[in-house]
């Protein structure tokens, strides 16, 4: 399918006035400065080396939050940080508030919609989790890519069309994916992504690569134009 697109001028870490520190695909190591600034602002332990997972989403069932709630405690037994931003169903708002209360040394649950803060999180986090049950298009994985935040997604709809799994043998792919709607498949993929992200050289190279993908409306528009020419 032909994907939606994002505005590459608005979602651009080189010029974005709302991130802590600007950077490009050539200076992607500066993402680490954004991470420590975000950690400071959220009162999380300030560590460049700790893998940070972001979940920026409407808190509704079709976004895969039942999978997350099932295994997030096991994932948090690893040395990671988890930052959630979003609002929605009362049961999920309560769950993630309680998760921060229980695991406050490594979790921040910000229960609201905040576009400016979302950009700070994309610029800071190493991984974006999108375990959606259904996702007709999805823009968050494209925004994350623009900021060098590596998508971890379920293979459905627009996520399947836009994110291809990393292949360690060929070096191809622009994220980490799982296909079954299953909490333990998700956890396995998240853990694999975390392990890769502990290698700073790999992580920065991968982030630099995905930052150069053209997810703009211009790219989508050209595909539409070609399609109509063939009719």
Language model: regions and residue ranges:
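Catalytic cores of carbohydrate-active enzymes across secretory and cytosolic contexts
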Residues: 1-231
């Amino acid at each position: 399918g032909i994907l939606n697109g994002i505005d590459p001028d608005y979602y651009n870490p080189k010029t974005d006035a709302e991130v802590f520190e600007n950077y490009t695909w050539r200076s992607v190591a500066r993402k680490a400065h954004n991470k420590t600034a975000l950690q400071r602002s959220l009162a999380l332990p300030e560590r460049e080396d700790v893998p940070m997972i972001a979940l920026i989403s409407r808190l509704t069932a079709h976004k895969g939050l039942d999978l997350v709630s099932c295994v997030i405690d096991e994932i948090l037994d690893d040395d990671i940080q988890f930052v959630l931003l979003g609002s929605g169903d009362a049961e999920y708002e309560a769950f993630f508030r309680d998760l921060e209360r229980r695991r406050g040394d490594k979790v921040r649950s910000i229960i609201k919609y905040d576009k400016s803060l979302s950009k700070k999180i994309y610029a800071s986090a190493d991984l974006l989790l999108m375990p959606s049950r259904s996702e007709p298009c999805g823009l968050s994985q494209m925004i994350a890519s623009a900021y060098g935040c590596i998508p971890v997604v379920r293979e459905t709809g627009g996520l399947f069309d836009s994110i291809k799994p990393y292949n360690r043998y060929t070096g191809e792919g622009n994220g980490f994916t799982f296909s079954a709607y299953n909490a333990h498949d998700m956890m396995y993929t998240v853990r694999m992504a975390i392990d890769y992200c502990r290698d700073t050289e790999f992580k920065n190279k991968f982030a630099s690569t995905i930052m150069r993908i053209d997810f703009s409306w211009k790219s989508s528009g050209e595909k539409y134009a070609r399609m109509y020419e063939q009719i």
